[in-house]
Amino acid sequence: MNIERADFVDRVKIFVKAGDGGNGCVSFRREKYVPKGGPDGGDGGDGGFVFLRANPSVSTLIEFVNKRKFVAENGKHGMGKKMKGRNGKDLFIDVPVGTVVKDAVTGEIIADLNEPGKIVCVARGGKGGRGNAHFATSTKQAPLIAERGEKGESRWLELELKILADVGLVGYPNVGKSSLISRISNARPKIANYPFTTLIPNLGVVKYDDFSFVVADIPGLIEGASEGVGLGNVFLRHVERCYLIAHVIDVSGYEREDPVRDYFVIREEMKKYSPFLLEKPEIVVANKIDLIGKEELEKILKRLRDATNREVIPVSALTGEGIDLLVSKLASIVREMKVEKSERKEEKFVKPSPVWRRLPEKFHLEVVKEDEGYWVVEGENLRVWIERFDLNQRDARLMLLQVLEKNGLNNKLKEAGVKEGDVVRIGDFEFEYRE
């Protein structure tokens, strides 16, 4: 797979909003000898959830450049005859395999979608409110009260694509990585004899007998890459995904004078970006051996092996010398690591519960004077009640006031200096204070 630069987007921000729960219904049966027909208001439907799903057919985040807002469907309101409102449809957003999902505000990593079909919930829908059928008691047989649905979650997300490749080719620009990937795979990258020809990661599929694996040409690595020189910090994150690092070194001496120094410079940049990269299996690929004499080559190979303590495979991407050995070695290592990974237990996706806050029974109340004769009751847990119920419903007001009175509302009003005839507001509901 060859990705054109114009289509390659690997970092975006999007906004997701889950659906709100539908409101419960106030309704009564039309039935003879039953007080007011008996309550039969149905519950509201749950709001739709928002999920991100790793889809192998999606290769970049380009689709999110022009569309950044994603909203799931709200739940429908409850109806009479105890009919529950329909749940809102869940929204599935397809992203490339290898996408890391972060909370854009906190930076917290929410999920790593590194397997095809892997799903993560990024916003939970609100639970539907209960209808008045739930509020009937032996003493309150015709309740005029129902709950509002909970609001669905919303958040800004940062999506960061880290390319999924089995082998990452790293090294200085112009050491022959693009030529090498075109020699061993089906990739056809742009190749020229000057630095930074490759400005996006090129991916190629390598076939070896009945086994295939993906190789990525990681561009932009030079001294200072971890700090952004040569776009290196942009591309180093793609190395994190690879099972194996193939460190390509130019041993010809024509453009790079000291292959050993080159090796350690790139390793240092990888370390600065993430020490974890140095723990990955690595082989050294000594390229351009066709441009150097056999005796001189042996000296350089010995220096590299002694200095790096790595297996060094001499190749020529131009003539093909050593390519078969290189592919065989890469396939062997990748195959072994894939078998090890496949033996790990896979996570099973379980859809979480919708947003539902338990109604608090205890409050820390505060009475605030907003104007002469006008007061507002505030409280840490009061917001849940205000959002859950329509205080224009008489029974909802009475239920809330009973709970507030148990928490000392009357005493708080007197202590604050509220006088008879003053207006007190709780949420959107206002009442005149009477002693």
Swiss-Prot record:
Cofactor field: Mg(2+)
CDD domains referenced in this protein's UniProt entry, alphabetically: Obg (cd01898)
Keywords: Cytoplasm, GTP-binding, Hydrolase, Magnesium, Metal-binding, Nucleotide-binding
Residues in OCT domain copies: 357-435
Binding site for Mg(2+): S178, T198
Domain Obg: start-end pairs: 6-164
Domain named OBG-type G: residues: 165-335
GO biological process, one term: ribosome biogenesis
Root EC class: hydrolase
EC number of the protein: 3.6.5.-
Annotated Gene Ontology cellular component terms: cytoplasm
InterPro entries xref list: G_OBG (IPR031167), GTP-bd (IPR006073), GTP-bd_Obg/CgtA (IPR014100), GTP-bd_prot_GTP1/OBG_C_sf (IPR036346), GTP1-OBG_CS (IPR006074), GTP1_OBG_dom (IPR006169), GTP1_OBG_dom_sf (IPR036726), OBG_GTPase (IPR045086)
Function of the molecule: An essential GTPase which binds GTP, GDP and possibly (p)ppGpp with moderate affinity, with high nucleotide exchange rates and a fairly low GTP hydrolysis rate. Plays a role in control of the cell cycle, stress response, ribosome biogenesis and in those bacteria that undergo differentiation, in morphogenesis control.
Name recorded for this polypeptide: GTPase Obg
